Amino acid sequence: MSTRPSKIVCVGRSYADHAEELGNAIPDYPVLFMKPPSSLSSLEKGISWNPAWGNCHHECELTLRIDKTLTAETNPAKALAAVGAVTLGLDLTLRDLQDDLKKKGQPWERAKAFDGSCVLADWVDVAEVKDWKHVHYTLHVNDELRQIGDTALLIFDIATLLADI
């Protein structure tokens, strides 16, 4: 298997609290967007962006590596079997630019898909995940707690998201 993915599919507005925090409606179906392979970066390399691009927000995300093909016929019950590994990632967003693009009704790619905007930690074998409904994670920046995540709070559970993707 190639170590470089053919595509990176992301889920926006996946947590009700975060959608409301940004003034977005809670979606009736998953909001998907993509990042190109050039957006990938290793956490070991650190995080950087051009400050001239504006304010950059980061969100810690549970990240799944899909090792088996998912099709339109894949149902949620079988979708989890396609996952080969998990990690945490940072989804970087040029928030001012994204807000401007949203107001104009334009796509978000310029704000979400720039080089280095998908920062990943090392992969962990999927066997380490004991309960997909309760994967808990935190993000600390300089020893300060910035984010708490838990799959129990997702609008759509992991299996449903995978089947939809």
Show the residue positions of the predicted features.
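Catalytic-core "active-site belt" of small-molecule-metabolizing enzymes
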Residues: 1-165
